[in-house]
UniProtKB/Swiss-Prot annotation:
Belongs to the KdpC family. The gene is kdpC. The keyword Ion transport applies. It is found in: Cell inner membrane. NCBIfam families: kdpC, PRK00315.1. Its main location: membrane. The lineage of its organism: Bacteria, Pseudomonadati, Thermodesulfobacteriota, Desulfuromonadia, Geobacterales. HAMAP family: KdpC. GO terms for molecular function: ATP binding; P-type potassium transmembrane transporter activity. GO terms for cellular component: plasma membrane. This is Potassium-transporting ATPase KdpC subunit.
Length: 189
C-alpha cells in the first residue's frame, strides 16, 4: 500500500499539470501573442459572419471561382473532422480512374498544357487551402470568361494574393484559394 500511494499521487499531480495547467497556459499565451491564429485564422466579413479559415480548403466547383486542390476526406470533401488522404497507391486502378476523371474535367474547362499535379491529386490532409501560383494562373482564363472580366484582372488578383515561402526560405510560393475567391466576388459586384 505504501508503494501505491505515491504512484496515485503522482498520477493525480501529472493529470492536473498535463491535462489542465499546461494546456490552459499554452492556450493563454497563444491568445495573447497570436490571437487570430489561436482562433483558427477565420475570415470574417463586415457583418461579422464567418466565411471560412485561411487554413482549411473549401469546395469550389463553379467556373467563376478558383478551383482548389481535390479533397478525399471521409463523408464529404474538405471535412475538417475527417482529415486524411485516400491512402490509395499510385498504381491503384480506382485511384488512376479518379485522377483521369479530374484531368478530363480540367481539360473540358479549357485548361491546356501540363496539368499541375495538385489539381489532379488530393493532398495527404485533404484540406489544403493553397495552390501554387502556376495552378492558379492556369485557371484565370476560365474564371475571366465566366465572370465577363479581363483575364488580366484575374491574373493581377492572383499575383496580389501570392505569398512567398515562409520566412523567405521554407516551402514554395502559394495562393490562398478562399482569399482569391472572396476578392473575385468583389470585382464583379
Amino acid at each position: 500500500m505504501k508503494d501505491i500511494k505515491p504512484a496515485i499521487l503522482l498520477f493525480i499531480m501529472f493529470t492536473i499539470i498535463c491535462g489542465g495547467i499546461y494546456p490552459a497556459l499554452v492556450t493563454g499565451i497563444a491568445h495573447a501573442l497570436f490571437p487570430d491564429q489561436a482562433k483558427g485564422s477565420l475570415i470574417i466579413d463586415k457583418a461579422g459572419k464567418e466565411l471560412g479559415s485561411n487554413l482549411i480548403g473549401q469546395p469550389f466547383s463553379a467556373p467563376q471561382y478558383l478551383w482548389p486542390r481535390p479533397s478525399v476526406t471521409a463523408e464529404f470533401g474538405y471535412n475538417p473532422s475527417a482529415s486524411g488522404g485516400s491512402n490509395s497507391g499510385q498504381t491503384n486502378p480506382d485511384y488512376l480512374k479518379t485522377v483521369a476523371e479530374r484531368v478530363k474535367t480540367l481539360r473540358e474547362s479549357g485548361m491546356t498544357g501540363l496539368i499541375p499535379t495538385e489539381l489532379a491529386q488530393a493532398s495527404a490532409s485533404g484540406l489544403d487551402p493553397h495552390l501554387s501560383p502556376q495552378a492558379a494562373r492556369l485557371q484565370a482564363a476560365r474564371i475571366a470568361k465566366a465572370r465577363g472580366i479581363p483575364e488580366t484582372a484575374v491574373q493581377k488578383l492572383i499575383n496580389e494574393n501570392t505569398a512567398g515561402p515562409q520566412l523567405g526560405i521554407l516551402g514554395a510560393a502559394r495562393v490562398n484559394v478562399l482569399a482569391v475567391n472572396l476578392k473575385l466576388d468583389t470585382l464583379t459586384r
